[in-house]
Amino acid sequence: MHYSQMRWMFFCLTALLHGSFIVNAAKILVYCPSISKSHVLLCSKYADLLHNAGHDTVLFIPSYSKLLDNYDGAKHAKVWRLHNVTEAYDTKLGTLANVMENSHIGFIDRLTFDADFWIDMCADLLGKLPEMQHIIDYKFDLVIYNEIDPCTPAIVRLFNIPKTVLLSSEAIMDKVAWNLGLPTLPSYVPSVEENPNHDRMSFFERMSNVYKFFQSIVVHYLQDIHVLNLFRKEVSSDFPSIAEIIRNVSLVLVNTDEIFDLPRSYSSKFVYVGMLEAGKDENVTLPKKQDDYFKKGKSGSVFVSFGTVTPFRSLPERIQLSILNAIQKLPDYHFVVKTTADDESSAQFFSTVQNVDLVDWVPQKAVLRHANLKLFVSHGGMNSVLETMYYGVPMVIMPVFTDQFRNGRNVERRGAGKMVLRETVVKETFFDAIHSVLEEKSYSSSVKRISHLMKNKPFTSEERVTKWIDFVLKYETSEHFDLESNNLSIIEHNHLDLFFYLCIISLLNFVVYRKIFKRKSQS
């Protein structure tokens, strides 16, 4: 074959393959308010994954927190921002110390907190709608959004994007299960938010779990009513309810791992994803200075980090003192405490302690892979927990918000560590928990077993996401995935009509037989 003919065939083949790639590519929007650094990082992983799978992917970040205005986490996907959305978020974060001192967030407090926290931001965001016209004009094929902010489903609805996918950054939320008709039995399924229960509950724990589930459903229902009223006032009088919007999603991606999470019933619309980028960045190592920190300690090192939302200086004094006491009573272990670069108060607090160093940032996966790391003391955020389980490191968890309580109890349930509740913390609390996990070998063996199972699952997290996204882009799945319970009333769903019918029949039978026996006795 002549050289020019070969070159022409090669050109045609390349064009054909390139054309096929273009046909299969879709425009995908990942909608991600800057609620926290970990939240934005999670969205970024999904955006990058779908970009690398050949899609035209955009990560859109409405700025809720000015602290994150320069952070997106995306390495490959395009990033669009909407700046100066609201000041309500950062203002509310200023009250974090008060929240940390609360033993429990009560029903009325929860209503007030959520109303102040989310609804004000929703009104601010809706006022920025004209600045989001370019999203509508781009004509996306699919959008992925998170369920945390109650305003998000309503805003996304205005973009007129044909396919929607819900990203649950936690375990399956109570409100999501409720809206999608998923059976949730509080007898063994722990409510997700502010609930330190697992699936094996005592009588009083079940009572508490029923209350937590009821509180969660009512609070989110009232949130949704506030959002709906706002949109019906500002957008359209026939704007659909938030429940209806969520009910019409094509898929729910759940950011937890079935190996770690507690078993529960779910439908085909739910896909457990687990830890994205597992095993990636294995070549990333700690900077020498930080590596030297973790090499210290005769018996090993302990990493202490309560996440970006809860720096060490924001902890109540009694909790700081309890952690200090544990560090001082475990001199053979070296502690590395994560705080912020400008945190002079924590530097002063630990100034006389020999076995502690402070860091403002570390590559967490590199820390968890460190050969000398023996324990991670954490707030229990889902991303941190999944990474720690994957790398086989025991944990001590002090939860702060929402699902972190459930995550901490799951760690205990799996034998991978201990949880301490902030309202119970006294001087010896952290020492008792840390010392126990470090000295009892069962914790290390349990978490290593979990790590082995997570690393050897049949399908990777990346495969699950990309294949399911491609599937829902290509096909309409509602007929096959939607539970009929979506169309049932509360009365039908809980058989209340059947129960009432049986009661009436039983009562009529009782009356009839009573009259028959009465007549017989008289005769």
Swiss-Prot record:
The keyword Glycoprotein applies. One of its GO terms (molecular function) is UDP-glycosyltransferase activity. Keywords: Glycoprotein, Glycosyltransferase, Membrane, Signal, Transferase, Transmembrane, Transmembrane helix. One of its GO terms (cellular component) is membrane. It is found in: Membrane. The chain crosses the membrane at residues 490-508. Glycans are attached at N84, N248, N283, N487. It is a single-pass membrane protein. This is Putative UDP-glucuronosyltransferase ugt-50. The lineage of its organism: Eukaryota, Metazoa, Ecdysozoa, Nematoda, Chromadorea.
